[in-house]
Amino acid sequence: MKTSVFAAILGLALFAVLCSGSELQEKDLKETLLSAIMETALEAQPEERECRYLFGGCKTTSDCCKHLGCKFRDKYCAWDFTFSK
């Protein structure tokens, strides 16, 4: 009787160890897949550029913020003499 109880407890302990090991592997797999999906999603989104503020360096007028234009000679953003409403 003692032997069968000991064998049953040993079997349950072994089963618990195996289940926890497979659960850890499954959790690690989920984390790996989630991080791969997040990286792919971040790469797929276009990067938004911030506009250049007053006296910021620029190459074209589209680099500058609203109501600023790129001065061709010195290549900096300056007021383009427009007003907002």
Curated annotation (Swiss-Prot):
Superkingdom of the organism of origin: Eukaryota
Pfam family, one: Toxin_12
Site (May be involved in interaction with voltage sensor): R52, K71
Name by which UniProt lists this protein: Kappa-theraphotoxin-Gr1a
Gene Ontology MF annotations: calcium channel regulator activity; ion channel inhibitor activity; potassium channel regulator activity; toxin activity
Tissue localization of expression: Expressed by the venom gland.
InterPro entries attached to this UniProt entry: Huwentoxin-1
SUPFAM superfamilies cross-referenced by the UniProt entry: omega toxin-like
Propiece span(s): 22-49
Keyword Cell division appears in the UniProt entry: no
Protein task: Inhibits Kv2.1/KCNB1 and Kv4.2/KCND2 voltage-gated potassium channels. Acts as a gating modifier by shifting channel openings to more depolarized voltages and acts via the occupancy of multiple binding sites on the channel. The toxin binding sites are situated on the S3-S4 extracellular linker of the channel. At least two hanatoxin molecules can occupy the Kv2.1/KCNB1 channel, and maybe more (three or four). Can also inhibit calcium channels (Cav2.1/CACNA1A). Needs to partition into the membrane in order to bind to the channel.
Residue(s) at site: Involved in active face: W79
Region Involved in active face: start-end pairs: 53-55
Location of this chain's protein in the cell: Secreted
Family, similarity comment: Belongs to the neurotoxin 10 (Hwtx-1) family. 09 (HaTx) subfamily.
Domain notes: The presence of a 'disulfide through disulfide knot' structurally defines this protein as a knottin.
Disulfide bonds: C51-C65, C58-C70, C64-C77
A GO CC term assigned to this protein in UniProt: extracellular region
UniProt keyword list: Calcium channel impairing toxin, Disulfide bond, Ion channel impairing toxin, Knottin, Neurotoxin, Potassium channel impairing toxin, Secreted, Signal, Toxin, Voltage-gated calcium channel impairing toxin, Voltage-gated potassium channel impairing toxin
Signal peptide limits: 1-21
